[in-house]
Amino acid sequence: DTPGVMLSSAARSFANRYGVAIGKAVVLMASHDSGWHDVFALAKAGVGIAAIIDVRESVDSALMHEADRLGITVRLNHSVIGVSGRHGVTSIKICNNDDYLGRRVDCDAVLMAGGWTPSVHLWSHSKGSLKWRDDLGAYVPDVPNENVQCVGACAGDWDFGTGAVIDMLPTPKDQSRIKAFVDFQNDVTAKDIKLA
């Protein structure tokens, strides 16, 4: 509950939406590539990145290259084992996952990125079984109990439909009276976006 510890995606949102830098010496604790991309975006926006700490023994070489290009220190096969600071982060303690010898890293914010997990709660409520996918590091729907099929992100397919555009479906209604929802939860239609 120390102020200054948050999800990397939240820190990126603060920077992109409000122009707020979450810190001057930020550390990322990651076990997933998405956090690296968040930190790269922050670094390009002028936020100081003290280090990337990743529990994995290896990551994509493109990530390492970009971190090097941006001057970001990377510690692979390491974990954050402690956060210091009473009213905010002042430092973290990290250790190598093999020898557990701790060392201190000064920072004023800690970002976390543990990856993405499919939302399987409704699937589980319908008594569908789950299976583990090592490539995702997550549980995904397996055998259904009801007549249900999961696709896209809820099935762990993060790129499903990336770049795809679906033409307007045929309808007998007057085209000017059709609602094309962009966001069901917030009741936003294509007309609302055009108007904005």
Which stretches of residues belong to each language-model region?
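Residues forming the flavin
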Residues: 1-196
